[in-house]
């Protein structure tokens, strides 16, 4: 909880958890993930609200808290959410920015089958599907590409390309301080890898290790070439496979370039969630696709201990 709500975050010195109280009772709660959206030459201060909830009475307490949080940023972002979120956000004037899709690729179908709590026909069907997907997925790494793990104490002195806006696509900034914050996550192991081609830095990815599932919570390569994006994601799968307990690798993305690359690397679409942005400063939202991954929220590290598999 301390790391999530109070640990130091760049450009957000205060607590990131907020409550609304009435007569000493908490009636609404929400926490924020501070983000900086890069679009053309603009820097848009965005917050993603997580852990948002409110009591039925007094009516409107959750909406009021959301509006108060919105006063601290240019925009508020929602990715999916509860039925209440999906109703309230559009009612507040939020604009839909597409869909965030979840993807998964099986790593060890037999190990997953042996770990099933209930060995029924559904488990057998999942094994057969996972085996088929594994056989169909590409496995060889492209020549000249390599991934090198970067530890927290190496981060400040290691150069690698970070996300930059492209024509028709807005991205979220990745500062050294924000990456360092995630490497200090106490609930899951998060690994950072710099990606190189012929020893030239080209990009990076972040993995969250949750025993049976490895998540690609962020990935980027400084290229518009589909082959370079495939190399990036195949390297991520290769590193995920180095964890012997992992039976699948999962990720999330909204932009078409990343999504197409994931499909070509053997990932399968496992569901989607609506993206919404609420313009709080009235200075205008990005007129482009919004690139969203797991790192924009608590999907990067959230789990209940058992880890629900999705492949």
Would you name each region that the model predicts?
Residues 44, 60-64, 80-87:
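Residues forming well-ordered secondary-structure scaffolds
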């Amino acid at each position: 909880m301390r790391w999530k709500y109070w640990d130091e975050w760049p450009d957000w010195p205060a607590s990131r958890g907020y409550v609304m109280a009435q007569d000493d009772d908490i009636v609404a709660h929400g926490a924020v993930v501070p983000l900086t959206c890069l679009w053309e030459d603009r820097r848009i201060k965005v917050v993603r609200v997580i852990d948002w909830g409110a009591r039925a009475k007094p009516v409107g307490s959750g909406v009021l808290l959301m509006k108060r949080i919105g006063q601290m940023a240019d925009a508020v972002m929602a990715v999916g959410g509860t039925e209440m979120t999906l109703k309230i956000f559009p009612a507040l004037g939020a604009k839909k920015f597409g869909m965030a899709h979840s993807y998964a690729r099986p790593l060890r179908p037999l190990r997953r089958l042996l770990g099933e709590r209930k060995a029924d026909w559904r488990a057998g069907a999942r094994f057969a599907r996972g085996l088929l997907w594994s056989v169909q997925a590409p496995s060889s790494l492209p020549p000249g590409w390599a991934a090198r793990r970067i530890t927290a104490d190496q981060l400040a002195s290691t150069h690698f390309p970070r996300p930059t806006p492209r024509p028709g696509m807005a991205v979220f900034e990745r500062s050294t301080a924000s990456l360092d914050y995630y490497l200090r996550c106490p609930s899951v192991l998060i690994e950072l890898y710099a990606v190189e081609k012929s020893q030239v830095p080209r990009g990076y990815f972040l993995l969250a290790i949750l025993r049976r599932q490895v998540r690609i919570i962020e990935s980027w390569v400084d290229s518009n070439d589909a082959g370079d994006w495939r190399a990036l994601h195949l390297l991520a799968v290769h590193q995920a496979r180095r964890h012997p307990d992992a039976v699948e690798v999962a990720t999330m993305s909204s932009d078409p370039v990343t999504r197409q690359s994931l499909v070509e690397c053997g990932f399968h679409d496992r569901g989607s969630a609506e993206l919404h942005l609420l313009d709080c400063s009235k200075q205008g939202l990005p007129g482009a696709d919004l690139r969203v991954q797991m790192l924009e929220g608590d999907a990067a590290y959230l789990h209940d201990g058992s880890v629900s598999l999705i492949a």
